[in-house]
């Protein structure tokens, strides 16, 4: 039975997952609407990812002494405003800025949210509680991304970002109603918190996160043109395939939580990185087979999100003196990989 207090974290994860991953499905629509090329539109993915990289440690450091619940509420209000700006952006330049701003609270929310989930979790169920939050992100790929892709193709991509903004506002309200007040743990100060960066184990975890997930983001950033140009799927079939990916992600994050609770996080990560390498290779080998790509869409999505809980636990293990800062770095690491491959793909 999922605790009611964890549901707002899942809802926030849903909104964040939708705004990040729906871009892959509506990239051609945005390109057409702003009169730019698809590779240029890919820079919007890079801008959002850079916002995550910058925002996660910066925002968390600024609010380290504040109660986590109030911090999460403010992050979601920022998220709502900046996604509304994306919906209203009249040109590529302003859209680029709005996507960067929308990315700022992303990693910070997951970083603080992971700490809140760990404090609300029953004994021995910390990774499972974190997985509940990440389940919202994966459900976005089952429901939100296909819906957003459909709306972007058939109505307007701007409507998609307005819906995301509304989800952010609803999350802020539910956080206030359902999440108990949790006192901030004493902070030694910003400079001392930065001492966690002297730990080799933290850098190892960040390298695993950014480099290890780069291949997945390279695949996912350009999944729509990959499926239409090489696999010969019709554009109208892309929402269905995004649903398949999302179902895989949902299954994967649950399995990842169980793996991380049962085994040492680093052991789980090694297994998952090995299988991800094999899956990405098969995506290249069987790109012209529609049947194979449907199976691989599910498996690749599952493997990618299964890495979330063990990576989050590994980061927290190496940053106990500044748990919110350390936890937020996971999303920075993920999006270093995301920003890099989206940029390289747009060249």
What are these regions (language model features)?
Residues 98-136:
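Cytoplasmic helix-loop-helix junction between adjacent transmembrane helices
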Residues 7, 78, 82-85, 93-102, ...:
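Paired small-residue
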Residues 54-93:
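Conserved MFS/SLC helix-loop-helix module at the cytosolic interface between two early adjacent transmembrane helices
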Residues 92-94, 122-177, 222, 226:
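Helix-loop-helix hairpin linking two adjacent transmembrane segments in secondary transporters
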Residues 35, 67, 88-94, 232, ...:
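Helix-breaking motifs and short loop linkers at transmembrane-helix boundaries and internal kinks
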Residues 318-347:
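A late C-terminal transmembrane helix in Major Facilitator Superfamily
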Residues 266-311:
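C-terminal transmembrane helical hairpin of 12-TM major facilitator-type secondary transporters
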